[in-house]
C-alpha cells in the first residue's frame, strides 16, 4: 500500500491510496467467505460453490462492495496515522481504479482539524464584576422562607378575593368566541398577584366571592409562543370554587428555631448572608473566567470548517433532547410549543456551536503550547468528585469505575481547568 497526499482548500486534504493487487485479491476472498452462503449456483449446494465459479456465474463485481470496504477499513486509518492527520468528519471516498488483475486505487477527501493561530492570551485585560449582598437581598430571601412556611386556610363564605389570596378556579378561554386548545382548567389554584396568568387576569378576580363567575378579558402578548394566540384578545369564563388566605408566620426567634438549626433570627440572617456571599463570589469567579477565555478565543485566528459547526449543533440538539426527555417531553412537542422546527432551532444554535468549537480548539492549542498535562493524581481526584454524584458508599471503587469508563473526558476536563487557571492568573483586572 502506498499513498499520496494533496492539500486542497483550507482544512481539506485529499489522499490517493493504492492497494496492491495481491492485497485486494485477499479482500475479495474475504468477501467471498463472508457472502458465499448467499449464492445459489446450479450443481452446487448453497454456499459450496468455489470462488472462480461464483466469479464466472455472477461476475466478480458481486464481491467488490465488501472487498472495497475491507480495503478502505484497513488502509485509510493507517494513512491517517502515518501523516498525523486529525479528521473532523468521515472521508469522501471516490474509486479511481477497480479492475481485476490491477491495483485497487481510491481517493479519500477529508476535512481536518484547523490550525489555530493564537493571539494574546496571557495578560488580557478583563473587567471583574462584584456582587455585594445587600440587606434587601437578605430580607427577600427571608421573605421567601416566610412564604414557604405560610399556613393556608379557607376563607369564610361571603369573603371576597384579595391580593395574596389563593383562588381555586375553573376557567375556559375563547379567542374570537371559539374555545382554544390548552385554554381550559378545573380546580386550578391561582395566587392572586403572582403574575402566573397573562396581562391583568388576576387583578380582575379581586372582589369576587365563592361560586361567583365572571368573564375576564385579556390580550395575549405578541410573543406568547403560539402563533394562533400571539397578540390576540381573549375572553376567559372564570368561576371561583374556593378562596384561601395565606397566614404568614411572624419573623422572630421562634420562626428561626422552627425553620433552621439556629436559635435567633439574627443568626438566620447571618447564615443567609454568608451563603449568598459565597454564591455571589462563585458567580463572579465564573463570569471572570468566561471573560478571560472569551478574550483568548477572540484574539485567536481560526478558520472553522462548516462540518465541525454542524457536528457541534448535532451534539447540542442531542443535549436538548436529553433534557426534554428528563422532563417527560420530546423534540416534536417542543417544536409545537415554541412554534419552531428543527431547522429554526439549528439556526438558533449555530452561533453558540461555532463558539463552542472555537473555544475547544483554542483551549487545546494553549494546553499544547504551555505543555499543560493532567497527573494521575489529578485524574483520580476528579473521578472521585464525579463518583460522589452517584454514591457515598465504596467511593474509591466507584471513582475507579468512573475513571476507567470516562478517562479521556476527565483528562480533558482537568486540563481545561488548569488552562483556565493559567489564563486567570495572568489576566489584568481593569475597572
Swiss-Prot record:
GO cellular component: cytoplasm
Lineage: Bacteria, Bacillati, Bacillota, Clostridia, Eubacteriales
A Pfam family assignment: Trigger_C
SUPFAM superfamilies per the UniProt record, alphabetical: FKBP-like (SSF54534), Triger factor/SurA peptide-binding domain-like (SSF109998), Trigger factor ribosome-binding domain (SSF102735)
Entry domain remark: Consists of 3 domains; the N-terminus binds the ribosome, the middle domain has PPIase activity, while the C-terminus has intrinsic chaperone activity on its own.
Gene3D superfamilies linked: 3.10.50.40, Trigger factor ribosome-binding domain, Trigger factor, C-terminal domain
Record bears the keyword Transcription regulation: no
GO MF assignments: peptidyl-prolyl cis-trans isomerase activity; protein folding chaperone; ribosome binding
EC top class named in words: isomerase
Cell compartment(s), UniProt: Cytoplasm
Family named by the database record: Belongs to the FKBP-type PPIase family. Tig subfamily.
Protein name, entry field: Trigger factor
Record's function text: Involved in protein export. Acts as a chaperone by maintaining the newly synthesized protein in an open conformation. Functions as a peptidyl-prolyl cis-trans isomerase.
Keywords associated with the record: Cell cycle, Cell division, Chaperone, Cytoplasm, Isomerase, Rotamase
Domain PPIase FKBP-type: 164-249
Catalytic activity: [protein]-peptidylproline (omega=180) = [protein]-peptidylproline (omega=0)
Highest rank taxon of the organism: Bacteria
InterPro entries, sorted: PPIase_dom_sf, PPIase_FKBP_dom, Trig_fac, Trigger_fac_C, Trigger_fac_C_sf, Trigger_fac_ribosome-bd_bac, Trigger_fac_ribosome-bd_sf, Trigger_fact/SurA_dom_sf
GO biological process annotation, one example: protein unfolding
This protein's encoding gene: tig
Signal peptide range: none
Predominant cellular place of this UniProt entry's protein: cytoplasm
EC number: 5.2.1.8
Amino acid at each position: 500500500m502506498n499513498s499520496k497526499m494533496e492539500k486542497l482548500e483550507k482544512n481539506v486534504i485529499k489522499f490517493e491510496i493504492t492497494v496492491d493487487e495481491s492485497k485486494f485479491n485477499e479482500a475479495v476472498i474475504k468477501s467471498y467467505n463472508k457472502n458465499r452462503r448467499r449464492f445459489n449456483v446450479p450443481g452446487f449446494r448453497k454456499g459450496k460453490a468455489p470462488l472462480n465459479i461464483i466469479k464466472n456465474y455472477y461476475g466478480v463485481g458481486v464481491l467488490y462492495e465488501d472487498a472495497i470496504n475491507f480495503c478502505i477499513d484497513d488502509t485509510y486509518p493507517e494513512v491517517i496515522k502515518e501523516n498525523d492527520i486529525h479528521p473532523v468528519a468521515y472521508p469522501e471516498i471516490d474509486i479511481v481504479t477497480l479492475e481485476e488483475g490491477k491495483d485497487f486505487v481510491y481517493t479519500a477527501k477529508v476535512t481536518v482539524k484547523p490550525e489555530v493561530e493564537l493571539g494574546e492570551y496571557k495578560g488580557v485585560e478583563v473587567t471583574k464584576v462584584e456582587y455585594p449582598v445587600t440587606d434587601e437581598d437578605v430580607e427577600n430571601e427571608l421573605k421567601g422562607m416566610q412564604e414557604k412556611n405560610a399556613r393556608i386556610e379557607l376563607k369564610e363564605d361571603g369573603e371576597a378575593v384579595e391580593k395574596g389570596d389563593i383562588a381555586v378556579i375553573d376557567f375556559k378561554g375563547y379567542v374570537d368566541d371559539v374555545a382554544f386548545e390548552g385554554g381550559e382548567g378545573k380546580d386550578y389554584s391561582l395566587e392572586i398577584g403572582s403574575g402566573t396568568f397573562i396581562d391583568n387576569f388576576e387583578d380582575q378576580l379581586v372582589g369576587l366571592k365563592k361560586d361567583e363567575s365572571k368573564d375576564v378579558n385579556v390580550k395575549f402578548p405578541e410573543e406568547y409562543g403560539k402563533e394562533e394566540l400571539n397578540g390576540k384578545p381573549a375572553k376567559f369564563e372564570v368561576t371561583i370554587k374556593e378562596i384561601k388566605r395565606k397566614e404568614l408566620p411572624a419573623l422572630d426567634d421562634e420562626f428561626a428555631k422552627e425553620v433552621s438549626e439556629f436559635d435567633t433570627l439574627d443568626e438566620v440572617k447571618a447564615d443567609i448572608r454568608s451563603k449568598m456571599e459565597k454564591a455571589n463570589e462563585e458567580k463572579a469567579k465564573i463570569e471572570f473566567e468566561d471573560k478571560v477565555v472569551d478574550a483568548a478565543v477572540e484574539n485567536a485566528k481560526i478558520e472553522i470548517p462548516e462540518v465541525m459547526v454542524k457536528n457541534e449543533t448535532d451534539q447540542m440538539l442531542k443535549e436538548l433532547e436529553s433534557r426534554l426527555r428528563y422532563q417527560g417531553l420530546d423534540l416534536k412537542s417542543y417544536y409545537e410549543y415554541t412554534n419552531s422546527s428543527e431547522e429554526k432551532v439549528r439556526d438558533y444554535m449555530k452561533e453558540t456551536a461555532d463558539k463552542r468549537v472555537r473555544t475547544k480548539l483554542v483551549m487545546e492549542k494553549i494546553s499544547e503550547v504551555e505543555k499543560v498535562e493532567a497527573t494521575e493524581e489529578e485524574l483520580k481526584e476528579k473521578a472521585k468528585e464525579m463518583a460522589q454524584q452517584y454514591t457515598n458508599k465504596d467511593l474509591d471503587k466507584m471513582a475507579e469505575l468512573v475513571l476507567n469508563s470516562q478517562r479521556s473526558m476527565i483528562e480533558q476536563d482537568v486540563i481545561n481547568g488548569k488552562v483556565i487557571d493559567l489564563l486567570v492568573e495572568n489576566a489584568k483586572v481593569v475597572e
